[in-house]
């Protein structure tokens, strides 16, 4: 479009930064013998509906998959006119090693990237342990440094926390909290 081809990986870098926030969450479970077990909660880039499909594809057989686990997905990209600056404005930076040459960059165009983080668990307690490790960092936003075309701070804003209770089968069937 407009004669110039470019790809700065800006959306990809924002998704990677978001996933990095949640990729080392662990919970502790205590068994009947009073032994404490640390469990790393796996994270994948996938819609929550694909949890089971991804597990089956990886193993080749239909099995119960390890819970809790998390996934995140990009759900929308919306132009944000409230943050718009003059897009005809250029920013100049010196070429590394040569102060007589300048690189010019156009002003960034503001978009809001909506991402949904889903937590699947079979025990309410496990879900609460994961959520309580996330919520204190968002007041309601957490700022992350992104090394995009130029390094900048990206606010990650917590908009909503909700629970979904899924049952499969009758009263004795499998139950999942998402």
Locations of regions flagged by a protein language model:
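Oligomerization/assembly interface segments of phage tail-like spikes and tubes
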Residues: 68-76, 107-123, 132-134, 175-178
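Short beta-strands and strand-coil junctions in structured, solvent-facing domains, enriched
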Residues: 79, 124-127
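Short, charged/polar micro-motifs that form catalytic or ligand-binding hotspots
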Residues: 1-8, 116-125
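Short acidic, glycine/tyrosine-flanked loop/strand segments centered on an H-E-D-like triad
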Residues: 86-121
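Small/polar-rich, solvent-exposed N-terminal microdomains that initiate assembly or binding
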Residues: 1-90
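Acidic-leaning, charged glycine-interspersed low-complexity segments
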Residues: 107-110, 129-131, 135-178
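Residue-level detector of functional hotspots within protein domains
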Residues: 56-63, 97-105, 130
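A short linear-motif detector with a strong N-terminal bias
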Residues: 48-52, 93-99, 159-164
């Amino acid at each position: 479009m407009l004669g110039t081809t470019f790809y700065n990986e800006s959306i990809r870098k924002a998704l990677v930064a978001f996933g990095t926030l949640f990729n080392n969450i662990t919970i502790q479970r205590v068994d009947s013998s009073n032994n404490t077990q640390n469990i790393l909660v796996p994270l994948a880039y996938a819609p929550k509906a694909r949890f089971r499909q991804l597990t089956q594809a990886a193993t080749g057989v239909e099995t119960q998959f390890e819970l809790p686990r998390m996934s995140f997905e990009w759900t929308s990209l919306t132009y944000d006119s409230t943050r718009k600056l003059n897009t005809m404005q250029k920013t100049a930076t010196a070429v590394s090693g040569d102060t007589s040459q300048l690189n010019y960059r156009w002003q960034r165009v503001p978009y809001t990237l909506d991402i949904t983080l889903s937590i699947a668990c079979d025990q309410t307690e496990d879900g609460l342990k994961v959520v309580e490790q996330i919520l204190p960092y968002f007041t309601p936003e957490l700022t992350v440094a992104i090394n995009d075309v130029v390094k900048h701070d990206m606010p990650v804003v917590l908009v909503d926390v909700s629970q979904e209770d899924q049952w499969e089968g009758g009263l004795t069937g499998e139950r999942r909290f998402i």
